[in-house]
């Protein structure tokens, strides 16, 4: 027999009990308590995220807003000079723990770091902390397209020099950032030439405005524990 785990919450004077067939406790928002990955719902007009610390703080705050704040969350971002790493490069793949990672609907994103960096983007898997798909090139998607997620990374999760918005501190129109496609789709659903990559599809236009080419300054957030 499949186990059902339930949690009672008080909302508008009523006790609401939520259950999960997967064995996870489900909060009033429907977020699985074991979730360890999401795309940020919060956006940024520029590539200045306040550095790695500012981006990590964003992930932590968003996680807390849906009851996942007990975990330690990190932004999937690469940098060329990390002050916490002797001003040496830090790769996004080395910031996020060892896995496995599931999204807030309980769907497995990847079991290991290696698995994560061989999979493709998917609108139904790469969702935000509230369980919503990111507007992109998937059929029926609302506009504007916002599937360009900031990473500064190659497909293997290592830093791309010159494509990190000066380590996520710059809003310069002369700098740019590497982005991935959360839905794994290019214009018209094209998946050729790396457009299906969740973390390294192409460079954005510049760090002064994340919107052109299909972005909104979103980031990927992973729980390390």
Where does each model-flagged region fall?
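C-terminal motif of bacterial Sec signal peptides marking the signal peptidase cleavage site
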Residues: 15-18
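Bacterial N-terminal signal peptides that target proteins for export
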Residues: 1-8
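Secreted/extracellular ectodomain signature
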Residues: 21-225
């Amino acid at each position: 027999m499949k186990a059902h785990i339930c949690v009672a919450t008080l909302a508008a004077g009523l006790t609401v009990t939520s259950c999960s067939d997967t064995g996870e406790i489900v909060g009033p928002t429907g977020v699985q308590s074991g979730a360890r990955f999401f795309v940020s719902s919060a956006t940024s007009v520029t590539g200045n995220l306040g550095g790695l610390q500012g981006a990590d703080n964003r992930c932590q705050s968003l996680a807390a807003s849906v009851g996942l704040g007990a975990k330690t969350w990190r932004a999937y971002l690469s940098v060329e000079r990390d002050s916490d790493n002797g001003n040496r490069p830090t790769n996004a793949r080395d910031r996020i723990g060892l896995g496995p990672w599931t999204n807030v609907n309980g769907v497995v994103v990847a079991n290991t770091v290696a698995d994560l960096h061989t999979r493709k983007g998917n609108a139904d898997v790469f969702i935000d902390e509230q369980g919503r798909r990111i507007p992109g090139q998937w059929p029926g998607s609302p506009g504007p397209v916002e599937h360009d997620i900031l990473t500064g990374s190659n497909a293997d999760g290592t830093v791309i020099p010159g494509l990190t918005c000066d380590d996520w501190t710059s809003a310069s129109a002369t700098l740019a950032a590497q982005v991935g496609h959360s839905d794994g789709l290019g214009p018209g659903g094209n998946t050729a030439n790396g457009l299906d990559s969740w973390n390294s599809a192409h460079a954005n236009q510049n760090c002064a405005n994340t919107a052109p080419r299909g972005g909104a300054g979103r980031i990927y957030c992973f729980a390390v524990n």
